[in-house]
A protein has these predicted regions:
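Core alpha/beta nucleotide-donor-binding catalytic domains of modification enzymes
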Residues: 1-31, 35-214
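ATP/NTP-dependent adenylation/nucleotidyl-transfer catalytic domains that generate, transfer
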Residues: 164, 169-170, 206-272
């Protein structure tokens, strides 16, 4: 386990290594009230002066989970008041959106969140959206993609940094991607900080939930205690390989100058 006083240092090291922030960035934080996003908020607040960050936290109410969701909203608002961080709340009807667009509620919720983050970022001239995915999320994503038959891109998992649009003016960063869930919760407990628990994460209704609650613990307990770390590390290797192959393919296509009248022409002899 990471010593309490080294926890923030480890995250800062990851931020600097991956170049997630620039000095003076305005950062939008996705704040659900769960352990991961609460940790992210508190860590970035403590690093605020080092990077000269402006911080805005956004909580999206999905229109599900009844009183539990209202509790999470109130908790998130009060936490931001305590930490003197700008707070924005957004209410939406995720079940209706899911039905309208033939999506799962999980997919619809994700769409609403990122659309909200992007909208609020543009209003404020913010260039960075920080979300709280961690190493266990990375391992779950890789396993889920493998089970769905994904190739090298799916095995790359969750990127630590990506552009939200083709323009590249807003990026999504994940400062906690190098941390285990248990380390995050341990740090919060030692800090005396409470968090909200989404009871839907405790069910096995979704594939990701079953991987989180059953498969990954089985791999860790019966095969290798560091299973999550090794899977996340492999995701990084796959990501580098995928980037290399993409760059090589792009260079090859460019050298062939093979686009003619909006059609792609490939030199078959060179491919043999």
């Amino acid at each position: 386990m990471i010593p309490h006083d080294k926890f923030i240092d480890k995250i800062k090291q990851y931020i600097d290594e991956k170049k997630l922030f620039s000095f003076g960035d305005h950062v939008i934080i996705g704040l659900s009230g769960g352990a991961d996003s609460v940790c992210l908020l508190l860590v970035l607040k403590r690093l605020q002066q080092i990077y000269n960050l402006s911080i805005t936290a956004i909580h999206v109410h999905h229109g599900i989970r009844g009183e539990s969701a209202e509790h999470d909203l109130k908790f998130s608002r009060q936490l931001c008041e305590k930490e003197e961080i700008e707070f924005v709340e957004k209410r939406c009807d995720v079940p209706a959106l899911a039905a309208k667009h033939h999506l799962t509620e999980e997919e619809a919720g994700r769409r609403v969140r990122y659309e909200t983050f992007e909208c609020e970022a543009k209003k404020r001239g913010a260039s960075v959206i920080a979300v709280a995915h961690h190493m266990d999320d990375q391992a779950e994503t890789v396993l889920m993609n493998l089970l769905r038959g994904s190739g090298i891109r799916g095995c790359s998992g969750i990127p630590c940094k990506r552009s939200l649009s083709d323009k590249g003016d807003i990026v999504v960063v994940r400062p906690l991607l190098g941390m285990r869930r248990e380390a995050i919760e341990a740090w919060l407990i030692e800090s005396g900080q409470e968090w909200c628990i989404d009871e839907t994460n405790l069910t096995d209704d979704y594939l990701r939930s079953r991987i989180r609650n059953r498969l990954l613990p089985l791999l860790s307990s019966e095969y290798n205690a560091q299973a999550a770390e090794h899977i996340a590390c492999a995701a990084g290797d796959f990501s580098e390989a995928e980037e290399y192959l993409r760059d090589q393919a792009q260079a090859l296509f460019s050298s062939w100058n093979c686009v003619l009248h909006k059609q792609m022409m490939l030199p078959v002899k060179e491919l043999k």
